[in-house]
């Protein structure tokens, strides 16, 4: 088991050797503010994530719904790893996404961004009218015109990411996430991996995947290459408070600390156009609504903290 863990950790050790120190989100010499020092593209003009300001989004009636194939019930084994920055699941090439312009993209992997720190409970990367959601799911694809992800990641039209924002309110358990969340304890430390048996990505997404925002941007982690066609779904994934707490508190980072707030800060739009394939609803970005949402976030944090306390204090029944 130790030999396997060491083998899986070799790419992480290689990254440390190549760049001097591992990049982080908020600590050390290579936190996200200083990424451009060793990854110059991270200081580019077409970076992600961005704030999706609905009153500025341009409706494009020619944009059609995304065509997702192979997302429904995949049989087999799917490696899941703690890479020190997030939880990442490898996906089969039978999963495809076709954009409105006819470009077909092949799924490579999916990963998650979340909050969890006491001062900031929300951890989505994209925001809507300045409002940050609890978490965000990214399904990374590469352009099928290229033979592999390794080739496509260096090409100007190489990548596409399908993103879904996560809400948590008084929802019951989302059973489509039960298998995934139950495996988090198996990858507590960076480099550890486990295997998911069977995966239904379609059910892990919002029920409605027809409406989206789209723009041209970058990867949100180093090397921040500016070759990503982003599709951010309008409708949300719903998780229970307990599921969200487990996502936020189950794995450790490279500093042996609980991995919290693994999201990049909002980047300037720099004149880019954000389009949608639906007519926007009236904006909720007023100052009043902003503070209402902020208060709701704080109340949600306190509620989840109470739920956590209840779980920890739940008596254990010992059988004779």
From Swiss-Prot:
Record-listed substrate binding positions: 220-221
Record has Hydrolase as a keyword: no
GO cellular component: extracellular space
Species name: Canis lupus familiaris
Keyword terms, alphabetized: Disulfide bond, Glycoprotein, Lyase, Metal-binding, Secreted, Signal, Zinc
Positions that bind Zn(2+): 111, 113, 138
EC number assigned by the record: 4.2.1.1
Protein name: Carbonic anhydrase 6
Cofactor(s) annotated in UniProt: Zn(2+)
Glycosylation positions in this chain: 256
Catalytic reaction annotation: hydrogencarbonate + H(+) = CO2 + H2O
